[in-house]
Amino acid sequence: AVNFSSTGDAADCVGCHTSHTVYRKNDEQSPSYDLNVAGLCSGCHADSVIVGTYFSAPEDSLAAASVALYHETVHGTRITDTGLVVSATCSDCHSPHRTLPGDSLASTLHRDSIATTCGRCHEDVLAKYAGAAHGGRSSGDAGDGHGHETPNCVDCHTAHGIVGAHEPNWFLHTVEECGQCHERLYETYLGTYHGKVTELGGELVAKCSDCHTAHDMRPATDALSSVHPTNVVATCAKCHEDANESFARYYVHGDPMNRAEFPLLFWPWVIVTAYVVGALLLFNVHTGMWLWRNARHAIRERRELRS
């Protein structure tokens, strides 16, 4: 309404519902029928002039590509390929008659409202998220204490580029998603067997969500946490059937550089590093002496031949 009154290029009632052939929303002939909404919105949001006018800033690049992204995602393909009318379409998230900017407190897509908006379809996920470490906080909170806002659905899944969690590409990159906030844990993960195989493209080794769950992650001190001492063996056993308490004591995020917290990793690292460096130095010294000896021997032989 604001853009329509000021510039005249925004959608109005007739633009979405037509003028005289107005059908009910549940009528397949209606432009606002669930299977038709994405195409209806594309009329403006795929228009190069409108996109260039309102979404030309670098930070709006994803919004500018929203139509193309949506049609390739799990929501869009369910609509276009299978005709699944319960799959989320534009009006389910943006509210058709009160579409507000994402920074508006009244918007369904404000940071404080996104989880509730997604939860209208994903009720079970919302229930887990709300009681977990990431849920139950607002954008006004201090976040995680390290300069990161508390993540919501869009931070992990994106807004329009949502792919199925079963997709190999998503599963491989979920570690990077978590690492954007958990930098230190990301680095220590990459130093483990799981992390190294993941970097090589391995899909079967454990990722963050395998151990911490996807939406119900909690501190290790929480008895409901999948990594609480009473639960961690069962968590490991999901992949390692013979896992026991000794197996579960493995340093998942051990840092060999942290002497105070991981002395059993630090000192072996120091000893092995010193051994390897010492062996290489000895090898280089020995090789240099051997080459020098051969060179002197060759020079001596030439002199003897000349004489």
Model-flagged regions — what are they?
Residues A1-S307:
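Short sequence/structural segments immediately N-terminal
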